[in-house]
């Protein structure tokens, strides 16, 4: 009886270890491959695509029009750094002081959860993982973040982030966003347009770049002030990000 009980547990343990090993190889290979190859698809795109199919939207196609950093306005890179992660050039994937502040805030305000994810963490999550707040997902995100910070340059992380970020329902990547909202390529985005796109990133399915609310407009103005305080376009050059 005891052996019969132990055998299934041993099998499940071995199965779990094999699955984790396979995922590690898959993700490790992905990190190595995407350090030089354009990213054709992300986990978020896959999630949106499956949801569309399940909802009967068979004409929906989630994709991103990849562009290199040379074809992205420096204002756009600066805007997302100003909005999401001002210590991006300095840290190794995690902003510890920001995490501590977020934890303290969330303890006091359980109904209004604040995140502290860096651009590196967001890139790891959007590229490889499902959405959610489980400890398992956060643990995997941390490992993947360390992986891309080790293998990729900061410029590469920012390039991938801008190409897979969601800027609206079914609008993935800065090139698609620039074409949809401003009818121009990403290389021609100005400071105001870049700040507006960055302003919707916390929740691109709720906040609209083509119909910005008062909150989005105020956030856009705040981002522009932060961009100036960081030093404008010279910030990108100083940190070898363009």
Curated annotation (Swiss-Prot):
EC number: 2.4.99.28
GO terms of biological process kind: cell wall organization; peptidoglycan biosynthetic process; regulation of cell shape
Swiss-Prot/TrEMBL keywords: Cell inner membrane, Cell membrane, Cell shape, Cell wall biogenesis/degradation, Glycosyltransferase, Membrane, Peptidoglycan synthesis, Transferase, Transmembrane, Transmembrane helix
Alphabetized InterPro entries for the sequence: Glyco_trans_51, Lysozyme-like_dom_sf, PBP_transglycosylase, Pep_trsgly
Biological pathway: Cell wall biogenesis; peptidoglycan biosynthesis
Subcellular location: Cell inner membrane
Catalytic activity: [GlcNAc-(1->4)-Mur2Ac(oyl-L-Ala-gamma-D-Glu-L-Lys-D-Ala-D-Ala)](n)-di-trans,octa-cis-undecaprenyl diphosphate + beta-D-GlcNAc-(1->4)-Mur2Ac(oyl-L-Ala-gamma-D-Glu-L-Lys-D-Ala-D-Ala)-di-trans,octa-cis-undecaprenyl diphosphate = [GlcNAc-(1->4)-Mur2Ac(oyl-L-Ala-gamma-D-Glu-L-Lys-D-Ala-D-Ala)](n+1)-di-trans,octa-cis-undecaprenyl diphosphate + di-trans,octa-cis-undecaprenyl diphosphate + H(+)
Family: Belongs to the glycosyltransferase 51 family.
Name of this protein: Biosynthetic peptidoglycan transglycosylase
Protein source organism: Salmonella agona (strain SL483)
């Amino acid at each position: 009886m005891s052996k019969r009980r132990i055998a299934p547990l041993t099998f499940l343990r071995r199965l779990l270890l094999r699955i984790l090993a396979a995922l590690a190889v898959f993700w490790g290979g992905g990190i190595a491959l995407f350090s030089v190859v354009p990213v054709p698809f992300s986990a978020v795109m896959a999630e949106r695509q499956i949801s569309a199919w399940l909802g009967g939207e068979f004409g929906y196609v989630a994709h991103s029009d990849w562009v290199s950093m040379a074809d992205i306005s420096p204002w756009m890179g600066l805007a997302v750094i100003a909005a999401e992660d001002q210590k991006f050039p300095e840290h190794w994937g995690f902003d510890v002081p920001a995490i501590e502040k977020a934890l303290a805030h969330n303890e006091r305000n359980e109904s209004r959860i604040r995140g502290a994810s860096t651009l590196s963490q967001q890139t790891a999550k959007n590229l490889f993982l499902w959405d959610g707040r489980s400890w398992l997902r956060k643990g995997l995100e941390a490992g993947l973040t360390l992986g891309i910070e080790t293998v990729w340059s900061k410029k590469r992380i920012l390039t991938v982030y801008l190409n897979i970020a969601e800027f609206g329902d079914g609008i993935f990547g800065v090139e698609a966003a620039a074409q949809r909202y401003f009818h121009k390529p990403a290389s021609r985005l100005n400071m105001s347009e870049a700040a507006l796109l960055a302003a919707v990133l916390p929740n691109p399915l709720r906040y609209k770049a083509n119909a910005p609310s008062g909150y989005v407009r105020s956030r856009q103005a705040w981002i522009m002030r932060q961009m100036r305080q960081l030093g404008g376009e010279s910030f990108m050059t100083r940190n070898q990000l363009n």
